[in-house]
Regions:
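N-terminal glycine-rich anion-binding loop in soluble enzyme alpha/beta folds
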Residues: 26-93, 164-200
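Short, well-structured alpha-helical segments in soluble
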Residues: 88-101, 203-216
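Glycine/small-residue-rich loop that forms an oxyanion/phosphate-binding "nest" at active or ligand-binding sites
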Residues: 98-136
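Periplasmic-binding protein-like
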Residues: 104-109, 157-159, 216-223
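Conserved beta-alpha
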Residues: 125, 129-190, 271
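Hydrophobic alpha-helical
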Residues: 205-238, 249-251
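C-terminal functional extensions of proteins
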Residues: 245-284, 288
Length: 291
C-alpha cells in the first residue's frame, strides 16, 4: 500500500495521524516522523567527499530539525592546500543551492580552509555570508569558538587529523583567538597523507585515551570528516574534561538557532559533559557547563 515505505504493510488505509507535543513532529502508528511544513529546517554545506557530517548531525539534532545539504564542488588534481584556497569563495555558491527552503540557519561544515583566515577573518566571512543568505551562517570552526567561549575555556589540547602545515594553521588560529594550545596529538604519522575520512572510531578513541587531560582544558577533535560522536560517547573523562568536536559544536550552534531545541536523546546524553547545557541531567557532575 502507499504506506509500505513507512512500515505500514498489510494495511489498506493510511493510519490516523496525530501531532506530537514536540515542534514539527507527527506520530504515525507509533512512528515519529518530522513534518517538513512545521519542523525547523537547517542548511548544511559539506565537502564533496565527506561521509561523516550528515550522519553525525542527524543523530544529534533529533526529530524536530530537518537538515538540507549542499555539497561543495569537487576540485580534482589539486593538493589539499590548493583545494582549501578554492573552497572559501565556493561557500556562497553552495549556500545558493538552498534557496527557497526558508532555512532557520546554515552551517558550513568546514574547518581546515577557515584556519588560514584567523578568527577575525572567519567572523567576517560568516557575517558576509549571513547578510547574503538572509539567515544566520556559521562555519564549524566559528561554532567551535562560540562553544569554547560559552564554556569559559581558553586552554585546549588539540587532536589533529591534518598534515603538519595545516596543523600549524590550526594552532595559529586558536592562539590568535586567545586560546592556549597546551598540546597537539597528531593522527597522522610522519609523511602520511591526509586520511580523516578513512579513520575509524577505534583509532580516534585510542588517540583520545593517549591524551592526558589537564584541568580547565578542553580536548578539541578538529575536522568535520573525523568520526567524533561515537568516540566522545565512549570516552569517560567526566564533566570537568570536555571533549569537543567540529560536528558536536556545529550541532550545538544549530540547536541554539532553533530556539534552543533540546536535540536528540543521544545529544542530551553527551551534552552535559561537553558543551553548554540548557537543562543538565541528574548524572552530570560538578564540571557541567550550564547555560
Amino acid at each position: 500500500g502507499p504506506g509500505a515505505a513507512f512500515g505500514w504493510r498489510g494495511s489498506s488505509r493510511i493510519p490516523a495521524r496525530r501531532r506530537d507535543a514536540r515542534h514539527g513532529v507527527l506520530a504515525v502508528s507509533g512512528l515519529v516522523l518530522p513534518d517538513p511544513a512545521t519542523a525547523y529546517r537547517v542548511g548544511v554545506v559539506v565537502p564533496p567527499s565527506n561521509p561523516v557530517v550528515e550522519p553525525e548531525l542527524d543523530v544529534l539534532l533529533g526529530d524536530e530539525i530537518l537538515q538540507y545539504g549542499a555539497r561543495l564542488p569537487r576540485f580534482t588534481g589539486l593538493s589539499l592546500e590548493e583545494r582549501n584556497q578554492r573552497y572559501l569563495p565556493a561557500y556562497a555558491e553552495a549556500l545558493d543551492q538552498l534557496y527557497g527552503l526558508d532555512v532557520t540557519c546554515a552551517l558550513v561544515a568546514m574547518t581546515g580552509p577557515n584556519y588560514q583566515l584567523g578568527l577575525d577573518g572567519d567572523r567576517a566571512l560568516c557575517a558576509e555570508l549571513t547578510e547574503r543568505f538572509g539567515a544566520p551562517v556559521s562555519t564549524a570552526s566559528l561554532a567551535i569558538y562560540r562553544t569554547l567561549n560559552s564554556l569559559g575555556i581558553n586552554r585546549i589540547q588539540l587532536l589533529s587529523p591534518y598534515p603538519d602545515w595545516l596543523t600549524g594553521e590550526t594552532v595559529r588560529y586558536w592562539e590568535g583567538a586567545g586560546m592556549t594550545v597546551v598540546a597537539v596529538e597528531h593522527l597522522l604519522g610522519e609523511g602520511q597523507a591526509f586520511s580523516a575520512y578513512e579513520t575509524c572510531t577505534e583509532e580516534v578513541v585510542a588517540h583520545l585515551q593517549s591524551v592526558e587531560p589537564e584541568a580547565d582544558c578542553a580536548v578539541l577533535v578538529t575536522g568535520t570528516g573525523l568520526v567524533s560522536v561515537a568516540s566522545i560517547y565512549q570516552m569517560d573523562y567526566g564533566c570537568s574534561r570536555p571533549i569537543l568536536s567540529s560536528n558536536l559544536c556545529g550541532a550545538w550552534w544549530i540547536l541554539q538557532q532553533c530556539d534552543r531545541s533540546p536535540g536528540s536523546r543521544l545529544y542530551r546524553e553527551i551534552a552535559p559533559g561537553h558543551v553548554p547545557c540548557e537543562d543538565p541531567g541528574p548524572d552530570c557532575g560538578p564540571g557541567c557547563h550550564e547555560l
